[in-house]
Amino acid sequence: MEAQYQSTNFLLQKVQHDLGRLEGTQNEQDAQVVVQSIYGDISTLKDNLQALDNYVSREQPARRQAARMRVDQLRMDVQRVDMAVSAVHTRMTQRWRSASEREELLSARYRPNDTALSIGDHELQLNDRLHSSHNRLDELISQGSAVLDNLKSQHFSLRGVSRKMHDIGQALGLSNSTLQVIDRRVREDWIFVIGCIVCCIFMYAFYRFWRG
């Protein structure tokens, strides 16, 4: 029993020493090696304690109480070291995770190529939209010009018709009311044509102002 006790006590001291090494590691890879070694030793310590309990049960009654006290004290030391290792490992795991997340955040934030590409894509989309808007305005102006030319031709036709109607009316002796209706229609057409001209001028001015 004494040899088993001394061996277990020596292994406990090794675990305590390795715990200090664990706290001094600088990177996760080295720390994982130490952690695996410590957990393996703790598992061995628990097996040794079980063997010591068997030895104590076989001791003579006069020596059994003293042996039990030594083994119980050793068990308490092992439990304290086990809890300390778990606490240190948890704290270091959180530190590694925080460092990894911080590194990922910094690498995602400072990527000049991606930023430049994003800005270039945005400018390209904006340029496409401006070009599309210019084409639509050009189409509207072309349509307005075509409508204006059509109205002008219709107006000249109406003026020719109006003159002919006046001539025919005078030749046929149409009443003044009929001639007044024709004149009013011609004036309304003039107002409509002028309104279309003003609308086209406004559209052209807005287009020039918008393009800068």
UniProtKB/Swiss-Prot annotation:
Q: Which residues lie on this side of the membrane: Cytoplasmic?
A: 1-189
The stretches that face the Vesicular side, renumbered to this chain, are 211-212
Q: Which UniProt keywords apply?
A: Endoplasmic reticulum, Golgi apparatus, Membrane, Protein transport, Transmembrane, Transmembrane helix, Transport
Entry keyword Transmembrane helix: yes
Decide whether keyword Transmembrane is in the record.
yes
The primary site where this protein sits is Golgi
Q: Which GO terms describe its molecular function?
A: SNAP receptor activity; SNARE binding
Bilayer-crossing regions: 190-210
One GO term of the cellular component aspect? ER to Golgi transport vesicle membrane
Q: Which GO terms describe its biological process?
A: protein transport; vesicle fusion
Q: What is its biological role?
A: Involved in transport of proteins from the cis/medial-Golgi to the trans-Golgi network.
User: Which protein family is named in the record?
Assistant: Belongs to the GOSR2 family.
Q: How does it assemble?
A: Part of a unique SNARE complex.
Q: Which PANTHER family match?
A: GOLGI SNAP RECEPTOR COMPLEX MEMBER 2, VESICLE TRANSPORT V-SNARE PROTEIN VTI1-RELATED
Q: What is this protein called?
A: Golgi SNAP receptor complex member 2 homolog memb-1
- Organism (species): Caenorhabditis briggsae
